[in-house]
């Protein structure tokens, strides 16, 4: 059986490492996310499997806090006449008292990256390129593991993607991925795994199998969502009530019918939220667009049908895009 790939997610404090892992794992409960720095204090792991076969192990690591001081310390570890390479220097550091005291969090990160097949270096693309980030990359490079930079938070207007691209290239890191964990692109995960496969050729079969399975799951979710909406429309269209002709009875029956439709719609909304791994608190549904209980247009008018057809087509396209985006975000 093929061994699962081990992937460490590393980076500065508060750059979205845990949020990225939640996206890749489709598990909103993984880890702890907060605006406070250094939220993650220990290494946490999770495994992605397909048909019971483990394919990828992902490890969330604490944020790097003082890479500048750590790099200075590492550069003083060589004894007279020694020229240690990166991994040997880190082994000596991890055996030192400083790794258990002053640089305890950094030591956890380096141990995990050295025990992994590769690392994802998560970057908050809204931040300027500072010396501390260059020193972080210099320290991580000593592990001797492939490192793929991931530009996070690239959807906003304040992102600095191009300066980061240039800075990474100057450090010899020419492959990178733009992957916003809040609003991930539709092809974000396949591109991330494809880029990883270029750095880690032996892991290509596992990564491709993950991509194929996720695409199959996305199609199944889409079909299940379409069925839920179709069942809602059929149930509402088939809803009939016989009432007396008195005005009071008609008003009461109309209100009761509206309430039944709202309840049926709400059940559909809740089922869709569960399908895409949202909770009820994540979305607020408005009432159906009715005017005095009736559609404003004659549904059988050819012009109305034409307009509805255009709107429906646009809505389906928008819904498909939104559905895929949600799928990438939370499952």
Positions of PLM-derived features:
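Conserved nucleotide-binding/hydrolysis micro-motifs of P-loop NTPases
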Residues: 39, 63-65, 126-128, 154-158, ...
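Membrane-inserting effector segments that mediate pore formation, membrane fusion
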Residues: 303-331
């Amino acid at each position: 059986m093929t061994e699962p790939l081990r992937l460490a997610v590393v980076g500065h404090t508060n750059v979205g490492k845990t949020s990225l892992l939640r996206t890749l794992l489709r598990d909103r409960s993984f880890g702890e996310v907060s605006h406070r720095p250094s939220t993650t204090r220990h290494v946490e792991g999770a495994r992605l499997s397909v048909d019971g076969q483990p394919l990828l192990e992902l490890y969330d690591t604490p944020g790097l806090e003082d890479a500048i001081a750590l790099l200075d310390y590492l550069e003083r570890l060589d004894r007279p006449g020694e020229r240690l390479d990166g991994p040997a220097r880190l082994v000596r550091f991890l055996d030192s008292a400083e790794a258990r005291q002053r640089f305890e969090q950094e030591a956890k990160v380096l141990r995990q990256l050295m025990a992994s097949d590769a690392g994802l270096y998560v970057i908050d693309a809204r931040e300027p390129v500072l010396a501390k980030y260059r020193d972080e990359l210099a320290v991580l490079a000593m592990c001797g593991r492939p490192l793929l930079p991931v530009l996070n938070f690239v959807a906003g207007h304040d992102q600095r993607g191009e300066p980061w691209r240039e800075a990474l290239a100057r450090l010899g890191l020419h492959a990178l991925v733009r992957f916003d964990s809040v609003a991930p692109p539709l092809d974000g995960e396949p591109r991330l795994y494809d880029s990883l496969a270029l750095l880690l050729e032996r892991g290509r079969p596992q990564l491709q199998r993950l991509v194929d399975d996720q695409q199959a799951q996305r199609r199944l979710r889409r079909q299940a969502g379409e069925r839920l909406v179709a069942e809602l429309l059929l149930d509402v269209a088939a809803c009939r009530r016989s009432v007396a002709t008195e005005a009071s009875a008609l008003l009461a029956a109309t209100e009761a019918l509206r309430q039944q439709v709202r309840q049926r719609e709400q059940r559909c909304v809740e089922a869709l939220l569960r399908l895409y791994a949202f909770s009820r608190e994540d979305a607020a549904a408005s009432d159906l667009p009715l005017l005095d209980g009736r559609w404003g247009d004659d549904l059988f008018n050819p012009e109305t049908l034409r307009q509805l057809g255009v709107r429906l087509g646009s809505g389906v396209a928008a819904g498909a895009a939104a559905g895929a985006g949600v799928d990438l975000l939370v499952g």
